[in-house]
């Protein structure tokens, strides 16, 4: 306790400026209230772009400004909103520019039972999203367990109730207590260790049990570490935490949730009287089915005995069957021989029809006919070719140059025997040959104008 704060700040009744006053007041407040917890309701919540959070913390009689800077705001897990009842931790400071004092916060937590409820809902949503509550992860409870591990407090009514139920319903089931604290901060680690130990002991099933209590009393069963330890177990677990109205995270993760520890024991301890009744029922069903089976076998045996005859009768039947088979074999052989004979006769007739002698006679007749027709065909062919040749000769005579020469025309040929078609092809004094219809004349060109050429006959 500072008895003389003014002396500590060096104040000796001097006159201060406003800035000096606010500065020294800030130092004093931060020194005295360096870390305090305050509870109140959030109002006027503001989140500027800087990432800082500002709000007013109030109760029914007063209010104070609060600042939660960006790094501290990032560590707050709960969503802040107006009207939320919270507990905050920080230091008292003074904003020198306005002379307003405020709380500079480093921690914000929901207050009271509401805080626990918000934390419960947040963890429940998280584990549900990860699939820890899904039906596919649940392990079925054994029908007739022989060894059961109980994770609970060694004192109190819970363990006595569980043992009482098993003694009454299934006294032969072996029970093993894995003691652990079930309340307080130490309970979390103890429950996790007890779960790992029990899961390694090869029990048929486990019971995680605690009696009723407040939400705070049962909170260790709502911790994430306990939930994940339950999920990691390969042994089926029955969660029996609190009364029937109490619900914990452990109930959701466990394979089966029982409303009370006694109910959990009843789930794993089938009533011996019920078992006796079930055995009696199964015995009656077994006897009935055996009697039915004996009756069916007796009837079957009688049927077989009726079908069973004397060996002599069996021999007579076999002899008769052998005679029948012999007759059928003979008949089949005869039918086969007949079919083969018919087929052979058919093939002989086809072979006779295709004999070479018959084919040769037919070909000889055809050759004689062709030999008789050949001279006549040759004469007719020669006659037709002669007529065709005469017709072509007449046609050739009509278009032949010799026929033209026979009508008084002639053809002039130069020294190389080429026909002269134009006067320009000649020269004066050139010797030419004039071919007539009969014979030739040697001529000489006297003049070769385009006018008719003048020729003179050579001696």
Curated annotation (Swiss-Prot):
First-level EC class: hydrolase
Gene Ontology CC annotations of this record: cytoplasm; exodeoxyribonuclease VII complex
Alphabetic keyword roster: Cytoplasm, Exonuclease, Hydrolase, Nuclease
Record keyword RNA-binding present: no
Domain of life: Bacteria
Primary location class: cytoplasm
Reaction(s) the record says it catalyses: Exonucleolytic cleavage in either 5'- to 3'- or 3'- to 5'-direction to yield nucleoside 5'-phosphates
Enzyme Commission number: 3.1.11.6
A GO BP annotation: DNA catabolic process
InterPro entries, per database record: Exonuc_VII_L, Exonuc_VII_lsu_C, OB-fold_nuc-bd_dom
GO MF, any single term: exodeoxyribonuclease VII activity
Family designation: Belongs to the XseA family.
Function per UniProt: Bidirectionally degrades single-stranded DNA into large acid-insoluble oligonucleotides, which are then degraded further into small acid-soluble oligonucleotides.
Subunit and interaction comment: Heterooligomer composed of large and small subunits.
Record protein name field: Exodeoxyribonuclease 7 large subunit
């Amino acid at each position: 306790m500072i008895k003389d704060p003014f002396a500590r700040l060096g104040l000796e009744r001097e006159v201060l400026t406003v800035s000096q006053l606010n500065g020294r007041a800030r130092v004093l407040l931060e020194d005295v209230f360096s870390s305090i917890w305050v509870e109140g309701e959030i109002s006027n919540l503001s989140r500027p772009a800087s990432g800082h959070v500002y709000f007013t913390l109030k109760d029914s009689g007063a209010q104070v400004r609060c600042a939660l800077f960006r790094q501290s705001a990032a560590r707050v897990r709960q969503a802040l909103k107006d009207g939320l009842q919270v507990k905050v931790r920080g230091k008292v400071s003074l904003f020198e520019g306005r002379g307003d004092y405020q709380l500079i916060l480093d921690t914000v937590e929901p207050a009271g039972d509401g805080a626990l409820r918000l934390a419960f809902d947040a963890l429940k949503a998280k584990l549900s999203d990860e699939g820890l509550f899904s039906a596919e992860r649940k392990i079925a409870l054994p029908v007739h367990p022989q060894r059961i591990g109980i994770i609970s407090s060694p004192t109190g009514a819970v363990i006595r109730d569980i043992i009482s139920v098993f003694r009454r319903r299934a006294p032969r089931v072996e029970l093993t207590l894995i003691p652990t604290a079930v309340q307080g901060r130490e309970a979390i680690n103890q429950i996790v260790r007890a779960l790992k130990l029990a899961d390694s002991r090869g029990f048929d099933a486990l019971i995680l049990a605690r009696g009723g209590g407040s939400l705070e009393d049962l909170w260790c069963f709502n911790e994430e570490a306990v939930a994940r330890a339950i999920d990691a177990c390969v042994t089926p677990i029955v969660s029996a935490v609190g009364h029937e109205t109490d619900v914990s995270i452990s109930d959701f993760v466990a394979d089966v949730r029982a409303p009370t520890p006694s109910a959990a024991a009843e789930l794993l301890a089938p009533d011996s009287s019920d078992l006796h009744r079930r055995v009696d029922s199964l015995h009656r069903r077994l006897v009935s089915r055996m009697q039915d089976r004996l009756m069916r076998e007796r009837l079957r045996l009688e049927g077989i005995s009726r079908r069973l005859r004397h060996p002599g009768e069996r021999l007579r039947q076999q002899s008769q069957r052998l005679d029948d088979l012999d007759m059928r074999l003979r008949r089949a052989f005869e039918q086969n021989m007949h079919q083969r004979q018919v087929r052979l006769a058919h093939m002989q007739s086809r072979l006779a029809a295709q004999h070479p002698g018959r084919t040769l006679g037919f070909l000889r007749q055809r050759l004689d006919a062709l030999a008789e027709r050949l001279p006549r065909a040759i004469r007719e062919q020669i006659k037709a070719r002669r007529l065709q040749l005469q017709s072509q000769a007449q046609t050739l005579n009509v278009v032949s140059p010799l026929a033209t020469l026979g009508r008084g025309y002639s053809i002039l040929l130069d020294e190389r025997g080429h026909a002269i078609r134009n006067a320009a092809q000649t020269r004066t004094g050139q010797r030419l040959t004039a071919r007539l219809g009969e014979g030739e004349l040697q001529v000489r060109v006297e003049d070769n104008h385009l006018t008719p050429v003048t020729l003179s006959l050579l001696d």
